[in-house]
From Swiss-Prot:
It comes from Pseudomonas reinekei. Exhibits a ferredoxin-like fold. It holds the Pfam family MmlI. Homodimer. Optimum pH is 6.3-6.5. This is 4-carboxymethyl-4-methylbutenolide mutase. It comes from the Bacteria. Changing C67S: 5-fold decrease in catalytic efficiency. Inhibited by p-chloromercuribenzoate. It catalyses: 4-methylmuconolactone = 3-methylmuconolactone. Isomerase involved in the degradation of 4-methylsalicylate and 5-methylsalicylate. Catalyzes the isomerization of the dead-end metabolite 4-methylmuconolactone (4-ML) to 3-methylmuconolactone (3-ML), which can then be further degraded through a modified 3-oxoadipate pathway. Can also use 1-methylbislactone but not 3-methyl-cis,cis-muconate.
Length: 107
């Protein structure tokens, strides 16, 4: 399974409520996406600083998204999809910045 995690920051000019609505629209647009096994998006509700190890300040993060793909082949199907291209265009509207991470399953 390939999983890509995205830290998302809304545009400065967008309200929190509008960002929330666009996250829902983006989730709805993911239905039936070729090659995409699963998509999740979660709004950041808080940012605790009482950690048991040194705190890493990465700035404001408004949401976390995650895309799942069953295989490299399915990821390529996704990347070549015209539907995915339209999905990315929507992302340009409501995502001001993002930081992606391809994760490796450990256990």
């Amino acid at each position: 399974m390939i999983r890509i995690l995205y830290l998302l920051v809304k545009p400065e000019s967008m309200s929190h409520e509008q960002f929330r609505k666009e996250c829902v629209v983006h989730f709805q647009m993911s239905a039936g996406m070729p090659g995409l096994h699963k998509y999740e998006v979660r709004l950041v509700a808080g940012n605790p600083t009482d950690t048991h190890v040194p705190y890493l300040d990465v700035g404001r993060i408004d949401a976390i998204g995650e895309c799942w793909f069953a295989s490299e082949e399915q990821y390529q199907v996704y990347m070549e999809s015209d539907i995915r291209k339209a999905w990315f265009e929507h992302g340009k509207y409501f995502i001001g910045q993002l930081k992606p991470f391809v994760t490796e399953e450990l256990v």
